[in-house]
């Protein structure tokens, strides 16, 4: 008798990806975040679809349509807050997923890593455009400030900004196109996720030791399906706690005021997950320099495989590199905090020091320390 799971054209793709997939036997809970990101993406697409049924992408009605969703639509408030806080959970899982890749040397799987960087940029663009849609004060001014950064590009900058706006300021045309892009991008992300998995399954997963797992693999199901399910339950618990007890904890109170082009909020700041990059942007007085630092703060991930000077792939047996990794983590926390503070002393200086430390750690300290650790192997 033929096994439909292994022979059916569609089923065998699912089977080789999620059931009979040979997986390293020792991957830890840090490997759970890939599946959690998939769950977050599914949540965002489903809740987003229901929100789009009631939302109107027009400057006169956008704000009131979001209010209508929260007040008049059945469980509209749950859907709206699941979508808003789901984005926060998405980025939390994303940062941990990237951190795990850095710590355990998963960036040596270059195709998977590069698709991951493209995914990160796409998710960030999607989240930014989504934040503009409620058309509150922070939505409007956030859109104005961030899109205006493109005007720093020499010669074509101003034309480029006006082309993106669809006019001479952020207005109806901007909101309409941002809604269109915000709707389509998650499906592009889902396609990129499939490519990400395709490349991952070409090489197989890394493991905490950074060694070859070829001699010791186990089937993905039931071992890791159960393990991922536990992670999913914990993620649902955290998300629902946030949604039901403190839905506005991570939001900005200014976004409960309708957009007013004539009144600038005292402190314009993005959502928490962009604050680290925003702090790096603000730490450089020159506009073009700030924009380049902002882009490079994320694009730097692409050159990490080239900066890998260690003989060992993982940081598990490299205590000095571990020390620098956790300093980098602490530095990102500091940058996130600084990004939410006003531009005044001492925050400016702290932000500049943290930005210098961020680039120094990745570009200089980590490669040098890895070389020292290589020498230590011979002692």
From Swiss-Prot:
Heme b b562 binds at residues 83, 182. This is Cytochrome b. Component of the ubiquinol-cytochrome c reductase complex (complex III or cytochrome b-c1 complex) that is part of the mitochondrial respiratory chain. The b-c1 complex mediates electron transfer from ubiquinol to cytochrome c. Contributes to the generation of a proton gradient across the mitochondrial membrane that is then used for ATP synthesis. Heme 1 (or BL or b562) is low-potential and absorbs at about 562 nm, and heme 2 (or BH or b566) is high-potential and absorbs at about 566 nm. The cytochrome bc1 complex contains 11 subunits: 3 respiratory subunits (MT-CYB, CYC1 and UQCRFS1), 2 core proteins (UQCRC1 and UQCRC2) and 6 low-molecular weight proteins (UQCRH/QCR6, UQCRB/QCR7, UQCRQ/QCR8, UQCR10/QCR9, UQCR11/QCR10 and a cleavage product of UQCRFS1). This cytochrome bc1 complex then forms a dimer. Its cofactor is heme b. GO terms for molecular function: metal ion binding; ubiquinol-cytochrome-c reductase activity. Belongs to the cytochrome b family. Changing residue 257 to T: In strain: Isolate DUPC 6271m and Isolate FMNH 85134. GO terms for biological process: mitochondrial electron transport, ubiquinol to cytochrome c. It is a multi-pass membrane protein. A ubiquinone binds at residue 201. Heme b b566 binds at residues 97, 196. The chain crosses the membrane at residues 33-53, 77-98, 113-133, 178-198, 226-246, 288-308, 320-340, 347-367. Binds 2 heme b groups non-covalently. It is found in: Mitochondrion inner membrane. Keywords: Electron transport, Heme, Iron, Membrane, Metal-binding, Mitochondrion, Mitochondrion inner membrane, Respiratory chain, Transmembrane, Transmembrane helix, Transport, Ubiquinone. It holds the Pfam family Cytochrom_B_C. One of its GO terms (cellular component) is respiratory chain complex III.
């Amino acid at each position: 008798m033929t096994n439909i799971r292994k022979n059916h054209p569609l089923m065998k793709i699912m089977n080789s990806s999620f059931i009979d997939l040979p997986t390293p036997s020792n991957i830890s809970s840090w490997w759970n975040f890939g599946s959690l990101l998939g769950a977050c993406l599914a949540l965002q697409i489903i809740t987003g679809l229901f929100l789009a049924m009631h939302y109107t992408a027009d400057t006169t009605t956008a704000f009131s349509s979001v209010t209508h969703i929260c007040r008049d639509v059945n469980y509209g408030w749950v859907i709206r807050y699941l979508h808003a806080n789901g984005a926060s959970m998405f980025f939390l899982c994303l940062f941990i997923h990237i951190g795990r890749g850095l710590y355990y040397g998963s960036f040596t799987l270059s195709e998977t890593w590069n698709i991951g960087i493209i995914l990160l940029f796409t998710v960030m663009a999607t989240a930014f455009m989504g934040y503009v849609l409620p058309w509150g004060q922070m939505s409007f001014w956030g859109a104005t400030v961030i899109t205006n950064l493109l005007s720093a590009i020499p010669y074509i900058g101003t034309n480029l900004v006006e082309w993106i706006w669809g006019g001479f300021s952020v207005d109806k045309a901007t909101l309409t196109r941002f809604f269109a892009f915000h709707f389509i991008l998650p499906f592009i992300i889902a396609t990129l996720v499939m490519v990400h998995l395709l490349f991952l399954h070409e090489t197989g997963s890394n493991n905490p030791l950074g060694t070859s797992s070829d001699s010791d693999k186990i089937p993905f199901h039931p071992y890791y399906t159960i393990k991922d399910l536990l992670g999913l339950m914990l993620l649902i618990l955290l998300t629902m706690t946030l949604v039901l007890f403190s839905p506005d904890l991570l939001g900005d109170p200014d976004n409960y005021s309708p957009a007013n082009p004539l009144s600038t909020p005292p402190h314009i700041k993005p959502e928490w997950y962009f604050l680290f990059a925003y702090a790096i942007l603000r730490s450089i007085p020159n506009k073009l320099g700030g924009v380049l630092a902002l882009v490079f703060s994320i694009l730097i991930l692409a050159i990490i495989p080239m900066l890998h000077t260690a003989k060992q792939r993982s940081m598990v047996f490299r205590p000095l590199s571990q020390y620098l990794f956790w300093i980098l983590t602490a530095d990102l926390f500091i940058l996130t905090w600084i990004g939410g503070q006003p531009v005044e002393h001492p925050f400016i200086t702290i932000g500049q020091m943290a930005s210098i430390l961020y680039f120094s750690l990745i570009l200089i300290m980590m490669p040098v320390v890895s070389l020292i650790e290589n020498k230590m192997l011979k002692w």
